[in-house]
Swiss-Prot record:
Protein name (record): Sulfate adenylyltransferase subunit 2
Keyword Transport applies: no
Xref: Gene3D superfamilies: HUPs (3.40.50.620)
E.C. no: 2.7.7.4
Major enzyme class: transferase
GO biological process terms, semicolon-separated: hydrogen sulfide biosynthetic process; sulfate assimilation
Length: 304
């Protein structure tokens, strides 16, 4: 058969690029780990990791930095997927944050994110002595991520310097680091949100049910629809929980993540919705609207 008869879709090319990056990380680094946040991008990353090394089990563990404020359905889904795939999962919760009872209700989005996510991630990476952390960030998500390299260098304090990034020519990646330094690696850098959903549809990848529209109890707060996920969310004066058809485009800590009104209850519906929406998926992340808590400033401090 002539080679010209072979046809590769854009999803095939994205998949091949991501698998190449995953294999490169395993080959080049001493002790890599895959950051598993349980969202759609993490689900795609896990699928790619399994595919990259099949039929052998993945040679690297997964790491979930748990804030204790994730949606209940996320934790249920996480535990089920770990059992189904047989991957090794490490869960880290910042013990200092637990001792101080840090939470998004009392301390606000910025403090909660810094202590339970950023500091928690740095603790977990240091304890595991990981020199490469694979994440599911994409360049189309947010402007600071748009300028970040696939292999994103971090100094010994996990800090990112956006003005001092290494050149990446074609598909050649520089994995050299000094002791104590590390690299964050983003195999989905060139994917879009629509690409992710098309790939999930094609590969039949399981995702958290919260991505699909259903009647859910929500309160309208600060211009967002916040899911009443458990009894820890106190209602403010005048607030009333109401049942609306909503879904989530992005998942994080539930008091800091807004839902969107939608009837997209299937993958086909979600893909059709993606083709029409003019809004970013991060419109539902409360932390992005907090002064001084931009994505770039968080990444400079060690956020993934």
């Amino acid at each position: 058969m002539d080679s010209s008869s072979f046809s590769f879709s854009h999803l095939d090319r994205l998949e091949a690029e991501s698998i190449h990056i995953l294999r490169e990380v395993v080959a080049e680094f001493r002790n890599p780990v895959l950051l598993y946040s349980v969202g759609k991008d993490s689900s795609v990353l896990l699928h790619l990791l399994l595919k990259a090394f099949s039929p052998a089990p993945p040679p690297i563990p997964l790491l979930h930095v748990d804030t204790r404020w994730k949606f209940r359905e996320m934790i249920t889904f996480r535990d089920r997927r770990v059992a189904e795939t047989g991957v090794q999962l490490r869960v880290h919760i910042n013990p200092e944050g637990v001792a101080q009872e840090i939470n998004p209700i009392t301390h606000g989005a910025a403090v909660h994110t810094d202590v339970m996510k950023t500091q928690g991630l740095r603790q977990a990476l240091e304890q595991g002595q990981f020199d490469a952390a694979i994440g599911g960030a994409r360049r189309d998500e947010e402007k600071s991520r748009a300028k970040e390299r696939v292999f994103s260098f971090r100094n010994a304090h996990h800090r990112w310097d956006p003005k001092n990034q290494r050149p990446e020519l074609w598909n050649v990646y520089n994995a050299r680091i000094h002791p104590g330094e590390s690299v964050r690696v983003f195999p989905l850098s060139n994917w879009t949100e629509l690409d992710v959903w098309l790939y999930i549809y094609r590969e039949k990848i399981p995702v958290v049910p919260l991505y699909f529209a259903a009647p859910r109890p929500v309160v309208e707060r600060d211009g967002m629809l916040i899911l009443v996920d458990d009894e820890r969310l106190p209602l403010r004066p005048g607030e009333v929980s109401k049942l609306l058809w909503v879904r989530f485009r992005t998942l994080g800590c539930y008091p800091l993540t807004g839902a969107v009104e939608s009837r997209a209850a299937t993958l086909e519906d979600i893909i059709a919705e993606m083709l029409l929406t003019p809004f970013s998926e991060r419109q539902g992340r409360l932390i992005d609207y907090v002064p001084g808590a931009s994505m770039e400033s968080k990444k400079i401090e060690g956020y993934f």
